[in-house]
Structures are given as C-alpha cells and as structure tokens.
C-alpha cells in the first residue's frame, strides 16, 4: 500500500474518540474494504483485468459548519495502466431523512505511483493532485435491510478530465458493537488526458478507463 495512504488511515484511526456513548450522540465513524474486479480499457482498446483493493474511512460529526471527512484508497495494477488513487473528501449532508441520505462536497484526488503505456509502447506517469466535485446518495428500501447506494466524483482540470462513479446495493446487519454492512455493485473510473503522452507524436489524447463489479464490507460505530 502507498505509504501516504497508510499513514493517513492510521492517523485517522488514532484520533477517533473511544467513547461508545459519544459515538451514539455526536459522531459516526465507518471503516470499510472492497475488492474491485476491474477490467481496463486503454485508448479505447480493451486490455487486461486486475483485482483492485479499496480501503476507506469516513467520520461524520455534529459540529455546525464543519464538513464531514472521508478518505479512500484504491490500488489498480494492470499491464497498460496502474495507479494509487487517494481521495480526500470533505462533504455536507444536503438531505438526511429516515429513508434517504444525500451528501455533496469536494474531493481532492492524489494519483501516485501511476503508469500509462502509450500505443507506441512509451510509458508515462500522471502523478498529480486534482480537484473534483463529490456527491453520494443512500436510499433505504422500506421494510427491508437493503439500501440503494451511489457515489459520484467529477473533475475537469487543466489537462485531465476525470470521473469515478459507483452504484450498488447495501445490506445492513446490526450487531452489538455497531452496524455491519455488506456491499456489492459496479464502479467506473474514467480518465481523459490532453497532454500526457507528449513524446508520442501520434497521440493527441490519452484515455485510461476501468470498470467492473465490486464486493465489500463496512463497519460503522
């Protein structure tokens, strides 16, 4: 795992209060892990598949005006493209009802340890930090333990247009220590570069696309 992501996750876990009563009344913390069964498409050509692990942490609180925070780490390693994607998200609850939750905010995405293989076999990296808009939704199916979930990140920076979209189902299993949820769905990451392969004269734009099913679990307390 990328050292930056590891340090950030450990720090986040260390600073969380340990009082269960405080958690029930003032904050909610969640940790989760997923496996993304991604299929890559580079410059509109289907390439190899890769199992991409995904770890995340969120912290929601009752402080007025201060955003909730989230941290997500994704590692994709394929033959024609690879990256460590670290998302730092700051968001507010726009709608919070018994059967529906909708959040909006911003995400700073750090791409690290990246590699892109151009059609002429030259290799380039796209290590950079980008600004993205963020939205997520959770709709509970009445009288069931199931939620319909979705998340969307979109950014249009100077030389990179990016989107990261997820949709799926979530099953809740309440336990004494908190809430355990199992997830499954589909995720798409789409990156469009305008000036990535500068030394490859025949390449005007570069495309890195990955999509596939994911499964995972989340614990909230």
Residue map of PLM features:
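Cleavable N-terminal export/targeting peptides
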Residues: 1-28, 221
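Gram-negative (and chloroplast) outer-membrane scaffold detector with strong preference
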Residues: 63-148
